[in-house]
């Protein structure tokens, strides 16, 4: 029993930025092993875009892990709060979505998350179920439990207040409503990104304020770096891997990450144990394993998770064909730009380079091709047409210039 609990806690802590209330988590896991009684784990997602990428799955993978140790996952789609817009980390007021946009974006979430989570022990919730019913009286009671001074402890709010930038009252409501979700759902544990710590602590505080006889533990997970290894994975930055992408594109993108970033992806995305990952590192260190083969295993694992082993095998074969013969892949990702855009800006915006300075160095080093011709002029600008831009041997993208 003690050995099982020790292993469980080690895996739960894996990759986490911070855990608040570890003793309570241990108590919950122990009770599950003794009585088979499951505990409630909550994680919320605002459906501001229709598709999930690997950055989102860091939390979902941790939810799946917790299911192995007794969690009943409540996967919260914040259809109500998405209409406010999470201001976390923003230096200006964020434009909210309307309900039609939110519900449209949420349509594919269930199909996507069940590629990772055990459906039997997962409940998908929408926070409009209780927040719509809260009403004016309930909202005032909720606001009365928190002070403006406490709100201004949040770095992003404090910065905007100091710089005389606008902060709407509605934005103050976001962490309160997210915290109230924990009250309504009776969460034992809440997961969130490390930028969400303040909001998660509000939930813990409100559970006490509303008289619940528990105080949720908190697990914060890091934001996954995108393919560039610099900025967080984001569709808007072009450095993402979507979980609904074609297998070949998914495999090729994962193979494009640096060897150092590969270990970050292993820790946060792979189902391999920490011991197995250490064995892989040991193999590379002692030259019994090649980094490319280890990266191929990671790419194969991730493709198989969202498709199947056969698709993963075919994607690996396709990548080997492209890599060895320096051929263009059959499936290319696409980006649209306006006529006149410069090659330096394109390389940065599609996530091939973290900065225009790096893009300039890559061009000077002969590493950038357009339609398989080496780019020598860093001031090159695109005219209307279709192009394939390439960085190194493995990174390709189709450009549609309008």
Swiss-Prot record:
Where in the cell does this protein reside? Cytoplasm
Cited SMART domains:
S4
- Could you state one GO biological process linked to this protein? tyrosyl-tRNA aminoacylation
Positions of ATP binding? 235
Protein's UniProt keywords contain RNA-binding: yes
Q: Does the keyword Cytoplasm apply?
A: yes
Q: Which InterPro entries match?
A: aa-tRNA-synth_I_CS, aa-tRNA-synth_Ic, Rossmann-like_a/b/a_fold, S4_RNA-bd, S4_RNA-bd_sf, Tyr-tRNA-ligase, Tyr-tRNA-ligase_bac-type, Tyr-tRNA-ligase_bac_2
Sorted alphabetically, the Gene Ontology cellular component annotations on this record are:
cytosol
- Short sequence motif 'KMSKS' region: positions: 232-236
| Any one Gene Ontology molecular-function term assigned to this protein's record | tyrosine-tRNA ligase activity
Reactions catalysed, semicolon-separated, are:
tRNA(Tyr) + L-tyrosine + ATP = L-tyrosyl-tRNA(Tyr) + AMP + diphosphate + H(+)
Q: EC?
A: 6.1.1.1
> According to the lineage, what is the superkingdom?
Bacteria
The chain positions of domain S4 RNA-binding read 341-401
What are the entry keywords? Aminoacyl-tRNA synthetase, ATP-binding, Cytoplasm, Ligase, Nucleotide-binding, Protein biosynthesis, RNA-binding
According to the UniProt entry, where does the motif 'HIGH' region sit in this chain? 47-56
Main localization is cytoplasm
Q: Which Pfam families match?
A: S4, tRNA-synt_1b
Q: Which family does it belong to?
A: Belongs to the class-I aminoacyl-tRNA synthetase family. TyrS type 2 subfamily.
Q: How does it assemble?
A: Homodimer.
PANTHER family in the record: TYROSINE--TRNA LIGASE, TYROSYL-TRNA SYNTHETASE
This molecule's function is given as: Catalyzes the attachment of tyrosine to tRNA(Tyr) in a two-step reaction: tyrosine is first activated by ATP to form Tyr-AMP and then transferred to the acceptor end of tRNA(Tyr).
- Provide the protein name: Tyrosine--tRNA ligase
Q: Which organism is it from?
A: Helicobacter pylori (strain J99 / ATCC 700824) (Campylobacter pylori J99)
The lineage is:
Bacteria, Pseudomonadati, Campylobacterota, Epsilonproteobacteria, Campylobacterales
